[in-house]
Each structure stands twice: as structure tokens, then as C-alpha cells.
Design a protein with these regions (language model features):
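Short amphipathic alpha-helix with an adjacent loop that forms part of the alpha/beta core around
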Residues: 192-202
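Residue-level marker of beta-strand positions
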Residues: 33, 83-84, 97, 141, ...
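C-terminal hydrophobic helical "lid"/dimerization subdomain
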Residues: 262-310
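Glycine-rich beta-strand-centered segment in the early N-terminal region that forms part
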Residues: 18-35, 45-91
Length: 310
């Protein structure tokens, strides 16, 4: 799937492109599933710059290695034809087959399905960045905004695993997911701060925003004494206005946390493969319906991770 310009997801078209043979240090992967992320839509709108066309979105996939270039070695060792793998921070993932740098490729655990594997690493490394940057530790009370979403549900699990008490904002339909991971659901909307104070009268130690809405950060500032323990991966403009809030990820003025996120990849895959982390899966779409998948993700109505299945 590709677009000839920066006119948004609606401009995506299915085309036949031969990925070719991998050059040294690269591998070819037959894609089994591709993660769909808001950043893909931003790329298609030129929000990361208007560089080379065609534009081929998709930064995370799972699949099977079909060819390897000379010296193709991933972070955990050599890569062989037939290996089941996960590739993250690639380009052109909305494909049936692609060539990727071996440095982006890690083994897929046998206990992890294709869709979950494709949806783990962007959300998981983002969640790891959130809990690490805010120093979540045993005994903390942590508020996670958007707790039933792809990033939020993983942040809940990681914080609970560190021994924190977790409160998670969600809609009515997301409450079961929040409870399943050991957190206490809080309905978002007007009066959020007051509802949190019913559960935590003295406020909370940490707030992690994956929702990107102003009320989440406003409530966080009211509930957390130390603003250096409030972090957002989505609400950058409002965070900048409020001041003192950690901005993490790919937004303007945000800390990308590249080294931390790269180091977290093997551990996240291992824990997910052993059933210690669960990727909450949302709807799946055929590759040719990538524009519809992106529309759902951008709407904020998707609960869990949306994936494409070539």
C-alpha cells in the first residue's frame, strides 16, 4: 500500500512492487500481520516532513524471513531463512513482503501470535518509556489515562508488575480490560478529578497520559504533586502550556527515548511470549482496507491494537 503524495490515508492504493533481494545487512520478510498506528496517518499527511514519494506507511510487522543478505545479524544474533520474526522501526510495513534492516528484526516467541507480535513493540516500548521516565516503583499509586487502549493497557500491566496500585481511565466498555490487568477503572469525562479522589483522596504519585486530551492532563496536574512524574505521549501542546510535564515519543520537543526503547524490545517480546504481557487486540482489516483501519485508529474508538492482515 502506498500513496503518491501527502493527501492522507484516503490516498493509499494497492500496487505491486517487487521488494527485490536483500542487500548486505538486510532481510526479506513475508508479512503475516502489520500494526496500525496514529503515526502512520501523520506520515501520510506530511506531518513528519514532505520528503520522498511514494509514501509507504507501516513501522511494525511480524512475518517469516524469505531471504537474507550477507552478514544479516539482528540484535540477538544471525537471522536465517524460515525464521519467524518481528520487525520494528521499518518502513513500508503495509505490504505482503518487504525488505528491512536486520538490526530491526528480532525472533518472534513461539507463544505469541502473529497479530499480537505485530502490535507489541511500538505500544510496548512506549509504555516502557512512560513507566521508566516517571520512575514507577512498588507502593506508588499510578493513574493511567486511556488504560484500555493499546499503549495504556500495556502501561497498566508494566506498572502493576512493578508493584504499583493502578487506576485506569476508560469508557464503560473498557472496564473489563482494566480490571483484568489488576487496575481499578475510572470513567473518563467531566468530573474525572473528583472520581479519582474517591479512590485516592490524597491524589496519586504518577500520571501517564496515553489519551492526549486536555482534561487528562488537567486532572493529572491537580492530582500529582511532582510534575516530573506526569508524562504524556500524545497531548504535547497542552503539556507545553501547563509546563513541567514530561513529553515522550515523536512529538515536537518530546524525548524519543530511542536507546531505552531499543533496549526494551527483547524483554517485552520474552514476557509476551511467556504470557506475562498481553497485547489487547482490536479489529483486524485486510491490507487493502488500510485507510479504513487508520480512520478507526484516528477516531479514538478502537479499543486495543488494530492490525492489517495481508
Amino acid at each position: 500500500m502506498q500513496a503518491e503524495g501527502f493527501d492522507g490515508p484516503e490516498a493509499l492504493r494497492a500496487v505491486e512492487v517487487d521488494p527485490g533481494e536483500p542487500t548486505p545487512g538486510r532481510v526479506r520478510i513475508a508479512v503475516r500481520a502489520a500494526g496500525v498506528n496514529p503515526a502512520d496517518a501523520k506520515l501520510l499527511r506530511g506531518m513528519f516532513g514532505r520528503g520522498r514519494v511514494p509514501v509507504r506507511p507501516g513501522s511494525e510487522v511480524s512475518g517469516v524471513v524469505t531471504a537474507v543478505g550477507e552478514g544479516a545479524e539482528g540484535p540477538l544474533g544471525p537471522i536465517l531463512v524460515g525464521d519467524e520474526v518481528v520487525a520494528f522501526r521499518v518502513s513500508g510495513g503495509y505490504s505482503a513482503e518487504l525488505v528491512a534492516p536486520a538490526s530491526a528484526v528480532l525472533p518472534k516467541p513461539a507463544g505469541l501470535g502473529w497479530a499480537a507480535a505485530a502490535g507489541l513493540l511500538l505500544a510496548g516500548t512506549t509504555a516502557e518509556h512512560l513507566v521508566e521516565a516517571t520512575r514507577v516503583s512498588s507502593g506508588d499509586t499510578v493513574l493511567v489515562h486511556g488504560a484500555s487502549g493499546a499503549v495504556g493497557s500495556l502501561a497498566v500491566q508494566l506498572a502493576v508488575a512493578r508493584g504499583a496500585r493502578v487506576l485506569g481511565t476508560t469508557s464503560e466498555r473498557g472496564e473489563e480490560v482494566v480490571r483484568r490487568f489488576g487496575a481499578e477503572p475510572v470513567r473518563y469525562g467531566a468530573g474525572l478529578e473528583e472520581r479519582v479522589r474517591v479512590l485516592a483522596p490524597g491524589g496519586v504519585d504518577v500520571a501517564l497520559d496515553t489519551a492526549g486530551i486536555d482534561e487528562a492532563l488537567d486532572a493529572s496536574v491537580a492530582l500529582v504533586a511532582d510534575r516530573s512524574r506526569i508524562a504524556t505521549v500524545a497531548g504535547f501542546e497542552h503539556a507545553a502550556r501547563l509546563g513541567g510535564i514530561l513529553m515522550l515519543g515523536g512529538g515536537p520537543g518530546a524525548d524519543p527515548g530511542t536507546a531505552l526503547r531499543d533496549a526494551a524490545r527483547p524483554g517485552l517480546l520474552d514476557r509476551a511470549g511467556r504470557g506475562e504481557l498481553e497485547v489487547v487486540l482490536g479489529p483486524s482489516f485486510p491490507l487493502t482496507e488500510a485507510a479504513a483501519a487508520l480512520a478507526l485508529v484516528e477516531s479514538g474508538r478502537a479499543r486495543g491494537k488494530t492490525v492489517l492482515l495481508p
